[in-house]
Amino acid sequence: MTAIAPVITIDGPSGAGKGTLCKAMAEALQWHLLDSGAIYRVLALAALHHHVGLASEDALVPLASHLDVRFVSTDGNLEVILEGEDVSGEIRTQEVANAASQVAAFPRVREALLRRQRAFREAPGLIADGRDMGTVVFPDAPVKIFLDASSEERANRRMLQLQEKGFSVNFERLLAEIKERDDRDRNRAVAPLVPAADALVLDSTRLSIEQVIEKALQYARQKLALA
């Protein structure tokens, strides 16, 4: 009987550093990587492209069911491919981020994408980045981490990222958007943003990314007894 590939789930709010942590862990362990948030962003982008209403669950479900998405790691960067097109940059806009949070609130949309996410579980293992990886998608994962940070710190990180790309941003507006999104994600009826009961809660507010990676890898290796 073939053993089920192990999964390390990394959940947490937007801007906590999940993406950077997951890439580092996947590289260190040489495991596969799933950015579940990207799947919802790809669906949101497809909906925007095809003029499908973000408030119409009936219209979104068939779009989600036939969504052709895959991840390709190239030179340490994760490329998100939608129907053969690299949409890695396009899905990272604030418009798409807000739209993704909206479509993720629908139960049948989540069900349509659930099987696709679980299909990423292959040997030697999977690093799963998301908001409900440890509570819904991979509840049997042997290692679960909930990465958090204050809303102010996350808004500041996002502002710096946007400024580096040449965008002019207002901190207070960005903070308000993050708080609104947090409230929506944490209070939705289906798969709210909460740590799994058996997850390690790691607050990155006052930690460098190197410290976060070190703590997460140490915890994962202890749980998995990896050398």
Swiss-Prot record:
Record keywords: ATP-binding, Cytoplasm, Kinase, Nucleotide-binding, Transferase
According to UniProt, the reaction catalysed is: CMP + ATP = CDP + ADP; dCMP + ATP = dCDP + ADP
Which locations, inside or outside the cell, does it occupy? Cytoplasm
Cytoplasm keyword on record: yes
* GO MF annotation list: ATP binding; CMP kinase activity; dCMP kinase activity
EC numbers, comma separated: 2.7.4.25
Residues recorded as binding ATP, renumbered to this chain, are: G12, P13, S14, G15, A16, G17, K18, G19, T20
Q: What is its main location?
A: cytoplasm
Q: Kindly list the cysteine pairs connected by disulfide bridges.
A: none
Q: Does the keyword Metal-binding apply?
A: no
Q: What SUPFAM superfamilies does the database record attribute to this sequence?
A: P-loop containing nucleoside triphosphate hydrolases (SSF52540)
Q: What GO terms in the biological process aspect are recorded for it?
A: nucleobase-containing small molecule interconversion; pyrimidine nucleotide metabolic process
Q: Which InterPro entries match?
A: Cytidylate_kin, Cytidylate_kinase_dom, P-loop_NTPase
* The organism's place on the tree of life at top rank: Bacteria
Q: Extract one GO cellular component term from the record.
A: cytosol
Tell me the Pfam families matching this sequence. Cytidylate_kin (PF02224)
In terms of PANTHER family, this protein maps to:
CYTIDYLATE KINASE, CYTIDYLATE KINASE/PANTOATE-BETA-ALANINE LIGASE
Give the record's family classification: Belongs to the cytidylate kinase family. Type 1 subfamily.
Query: This protein is called what?
Result: Cytidylate kinase
Identify the species of origin.
Salmonella arizonae (strain ATCC BAA-731 / CDC346-86 / RSK2980)
For this protein's source organism, the top of the classification is: Bacteria, Pseudomonadati, Pseudomonadota, Gammaproteobacteria, Enterobacterales
